[in-house]
Amino acid sequence: MIGPVTTYLVAGGSRGIGLELVRMLAGSAARIDVWSRSADALPIEGPVRHVPCDVTGPDPLPDPPESIQGAVYCPGTVNLKSFRALSEDDFRRDWEVNLLGAVRFLKACQPRLKGVDGEPASVVLFSTVAVAQGMPMHSSVAAAKGAVEGLMRSLAAEWAPKVRINAIAPALVDTPLVERMLSTPEKREAMAARYPLKRVGTTSDAAALARFLLSPESGWITGQVLGLDGGMSTVRV
């Protein structure tokens, strides 16, 4: 549901995909609370409110809005190392940010998730194409995001019909997390060549899909992982 009575809670909404989503929602929402460690480039005006928060920290999470129609968890990690090079701390950090942070976020949100006008509330999580596609150097993040997908499906069953919950599984999206991978024209061209659509993803690509999953247009979609990967996972050209 997207409209003048809607309230959204976006974790990690001050950078990358989360920031782009906040910009897309800002013109049509009553309130958008953004939980993140810093405001960064966040446009704190109109319905947008920044609440300092570290979802992986020791402190209790802030009190969420009284009624939430849409919640999105954007924090993630890009920790591309060989299995041999990964330490247990690497696995633990990826697990804490991707899964346990999402668990804490969802536990805070659940009592406040309320649909309007007969529509369920909607939750969007982020996975990665590397869960379904075996990729080298992705074992830690793929393990953590695979757990996110399992969590999402379980909660989709548990929370229906009052709440829908889905996940987006992107391939490479041009965000600050991957800036070193796209730091030269040559690197960008090489990355783009891996995809049937011959470009890397943009924050607008991912945010637009998240916005769709928050809207009534996706009202019969729950428990799904939606690929956003330029055709990588299904197309061979």
Walk through the language-model features, giving the residues of each.
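Alpha-helical segment proximal to the catalytic Tyr-Lys
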Residues: 111, 156-161
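Active-site helix of classical SDR
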Residues: 106, 144, 152
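Short, small/polar-rich loop/turn modules that mediate ligand/substrate recognition or access, typified
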Residues: 160-164, 221-223
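Substrate-binding pocket helix/loop in short-chain dehydrogenase/reductase
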Residues: 82-83, 87-95, 187, 191
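Active-site loop-to-helix junction immediately N-terminal to the catalytic Tyr of the SDR YXXXK motif
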Residues: 86, 134-142, 154
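N-terminal Rossmann NAD(P)H-binding glycine-rich loop of SDR-like oxidoreductase domains
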Residues: 14, 22
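Short C-terminal tail/terminal secondary-structure segment
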Residues: 211, 222-237
